[in-house]
Design a protein with these regions (language model features):
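Register position in tetratricopeptide repeats
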Residues: 35-36, 69-70, 103-104, 137-138, ...
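Conserved structural position within tetratricopeptide repeats
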Residues: 35, 47-51, 81-85, 115-119, ...
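Helix-start (N-cap) detector for alpha-helical repeat units in TPR-like alpha-solenoids
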Residues: 22-24, 57-58, 91-92, 125-126, ...
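Terminal, low-structured helical/coil segments at or just beyond the last alpha-helical repeat
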Residues: 150-213
Length: 213
């Protein structure tokens, strides 16, 4: 009887570590399939992960990335919002949220998302460009032009910004589309084991509550 109780207690103690191991294994498999272009499979894996551990922002983000590749922009945007509720300090998540909103033509939401991303990483010119692009799309020509002047002062050879500035001045439909950051480093998101180390840089001004739905 006593031996049975001891075995039962030992099983209870090992359950959390076993569950954590399974989640890490699933996350690894999800990343692999995402990297290899099996987006439906990766989406299904990350969906299982968030069902088991809904507070894991990385899984929400990678599921959003999978849906974005599948052109499910509404689903991707919703998953990004879940990730941002859990972790509002990573620029890559805001970038993906901004891009999905551009695809959905929700430019006001994209402006806010890229503002958050710029607060975290001021040196990414694509964030600045995409915000200027969205500002023009919502009709704020003057602010968009001011942003483009700033961009070209920092990056004089940025051809896309030169073209967009020309379009804004002429008042015509942009010929240059919003820009995706090349080679997004989603694998550099803090891992499951790094939750208490290497915290991302905090944003200075804007908080998640500013994001339109």
């Amino acid at each position: 009887m006593l031996r049975g109780i001891v075995v039962f207690l030992l099983c209870l103690l090992t359950l959390p570590s076993a569950a954590q191991y399974n989640i890490k294994k699933m996350m690894g498999e999800g990343r692999r399939t995402l990297d290899e272009g099996y987006y439906v499979t990766s989406m299904q894996i990350f969906s299982r992960v968030v069902a088991l551990k809904p507070n894991l922002y990385e899984a929400w983000y990678l599921m959003a990335l999978s849906k974005n590749h599948l052109e499910d922009y509404k689903g991707a945007a919703n998953d990004c919002r879940q990730a941002l509720v859990l972790q509002p300090y990573i620029a890559d998540i805001y970038e993906l949220y901004g891009m999905t909103n551009i695809r959905l033509e929700r430019y006001d939401s994209a402006v806010v998302a890229y503002t958050h991303a710029i607060d975290i990483n001021t040196d990414n010119r694509d964030y600045w460009f995409n915000r200027a692009y969205c500002l023009y799309q919502v009709g704020d020509k003057n602010t968009s032009l001011s942003q483009l002047d700033y961009i070209l002062k920092r990056w004089p050879s940025f051809d896309a910004a030169l073209q967009l500035r020309s379009d804004v001045i002429a008042g015509r439909k942009p010929r240059q589309q919003a820009s995706n950051t090349k080679n997004p480093q989603f694998y550099q998101l803090p891992s499951l084991q790094d939750d208490n180390r290497n915290r991302p840089t905090l944003m200075r001004n804007h908080m998640l509550t500013d994001l339109p739905k």
